[in-house]
């Protein structure tokens, strides 16, 4: 089935299309980038040469360039970089970001030996969920689940100790009578 020959680029009069090369910011971004010392960095010939525009499924042009063609990355604005660093320093320390969050699996297993039987399986399950979240790359979720497993394990261990103390106390007071 033959298609009529279409131009490679849509005309500027068509609705929804934009003349990408008419924008001065686009030309500046495609041809040069400045580093901190105001020295011009040369990009590869694929960026400074003619644009390779292709049609996507909606009929709009897009540029097809892989990341390997860049010789130097475009610099980020200093205000964004400094605000990112400041917010990350204010919220968490560098050492906390580098270490993996604990899942408290051993503490959850110890809690399983306490006499609060159906409830002491919950920290074990949450601890395993924390470990799997860490393996999937969800560090915040793993940290949150690890803390919850620790809290529940400690709570159930204390409840188990209280139950044992009550049982021993009742046992010795009943034998004396």
Swiss-Prot record:
Region (Disordered): 71-92
Top-rank taxon, per record: Eukaryota
Predominant place of localization: membrane
InterPro entries: CD225/Dispanin (IPR051423), CD225/Dispanin_fam (IPR007593)
PANTHER family, alphabetized: NG5 (PTHR14948), TRAFFICKING REGULATOR OF GLUT4 1 (PTHR14948:SF1)
Subunit structure: Interacts with SLC2A4; the interaction is required for proper SLC2A4 reacycling after insulin stimulation.
Name by which UniProt lists this protein: Trafficking regulator of GLUT4 1
Organism field: Homo sapiens (Human)
Gene coding for it: TRARG1
């Amino acid at each position: 089935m033959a298609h009529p020959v279409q131009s490679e680029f849509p005309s500027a009069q068509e609705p929804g299309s934009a003349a990408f090369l008419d924008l001065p910011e686009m030309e500046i971004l495609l041809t040069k980038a400045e580093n901190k010392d105001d020295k011009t960095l040369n990009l590869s010939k694929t960026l400074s040469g003619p644009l390779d525009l292709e049609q996507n499924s909606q009929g709009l042009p897009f540029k097809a360039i892989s990341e390997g063609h860049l010789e130097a990355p475009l610099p980020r604005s200093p205000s964004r970089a400094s605000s990112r660093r400041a917010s990350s320093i204010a919220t968490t320390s560098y050492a906390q970001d580098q270490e993996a969050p604990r899942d408290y699996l051993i503490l959850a297993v110890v809690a399983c030996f306490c006499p609060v039987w159906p409830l002491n399986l919950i920290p074990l399950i949450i601890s395993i969920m924390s470990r799997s979240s860490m393996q999937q790359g969800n560090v915040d979720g793993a940290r949150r689940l690890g803390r919850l497993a620790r809290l529940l394990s400690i709570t159930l261990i204390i409840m188990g100790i209280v139950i044992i103390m009550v049982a021993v106390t009742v046992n010795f007071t009943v034998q004396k009578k």
